[in-house]
């Protein structure tokens, strides 16, 4: 089997979905911008040698429909001989795109792939056109399709208080703001034009979604968003709604060395897992356990973790059962997470992987873990190794 490596990884800034920076920018343009960026940043790469593009996207309709991966690649001017496909594992879509490309390279069906994902939640809302089969109610609770209620359930089962959630959410914004001020996102963000609140075109090189003024006290005044009577999950302790894209250049290790490209990380192991849809947010636990076993590692071997923050009430139980709760400030989401940056569904898997690789380099650690929950009860995880 071929070793598979990450040569480059980038993302757009995260734009606010409601009247945000990308309100006049389409999903295909966000995607094409990154595809072009990967090629221009790596001039040794002949675009004709790219085998396939795997692009995550959840709401594959309207501007994100009809194979947005191919549409974006054509906009980007990538040679017509390069194939492209759109991948959907809901929240884990772009991490699944990475897994698909990795397997193709491992078995020799490809040497070079571009992977990534996009979601413009302002143009194509998360619930647009969703129509669950009525028969699902025989085996799955209706509330399992309501992500906020699954977070309420998981938090209650694990004794996660409102105070704990508000503290975790405030931490996300504070750390993301600090990362912005200190330039820790600079290496991963590829600036792109958008419009400010006055409609003026400007170059965005920072995340619009972060709220640096967020405090635990301010969050404590918010009403529960999903269970008005008994709930603890608020809009403030949930992932923000944002628009964005992310991308990676993935290669066989020997091809990267042939081209003289810097290898940033190796894909050490991958896993997906299912769990009860009513506690869909628990998926990272079984997925991570599988990935660690396949890598021959324990959680103590992992030096840096990116755990997608769908909800604080979901992230904390996962951290607890993975043995990370007392190590959060040492190695979990040190630049904040989706509560501050947002969770553009199809984008997030490669976004957290990109942030992870940059963090692994910054803190000089050998192994890193990126993992996330997936709607209707799944989890996905990837272990990376610095070479």
From Swiss-Prot:
The keyword Chloroplast does not apply. It is an enzyme of class 2 (transferase). Pfam families: Thiolase_C, Thiolase_N. PROSITE patterns: THIOLASE_1 (PS00098), THIOLASE_2 (PS00737), THIOLASE_3 (PS00099). The active site is at 91 (acyl-thioester intermediate), 343 (proton acceptor), 373 (proton acceptor). Pathway: Lipid metabolism; fatty acid beta-oxidation. It catalyses: an acyl-CoA + acetyl-CoA = a 3-oxoacyl-CoA + CoA. Keywords: Acyltransferase, Cytoplasm, Fatty acid metabolism, Lipid degradation, Lipid metabolism, Transferase. One of its GO terms (molecular function) is acetyl-CoA C-acyltransferase activity. Its main location: cytoplasm. It comes from the Bacteria. Disulfide bonds: none annotated. It is found in: Cytoplasm. Its EC number is 2.3.1.16. Heterotetramer of two alpha chains (FadB) and two beta chains (FadA). Belongs to the thiolase-like superfamily. Thiolase family. Catalyzes the final step of fatty acid oxidation in which acetyl-CoA is released and the CoA ester of a fatty acid two carbons shorter is formed. This is 3-ketoacyl-CoA thiolase.
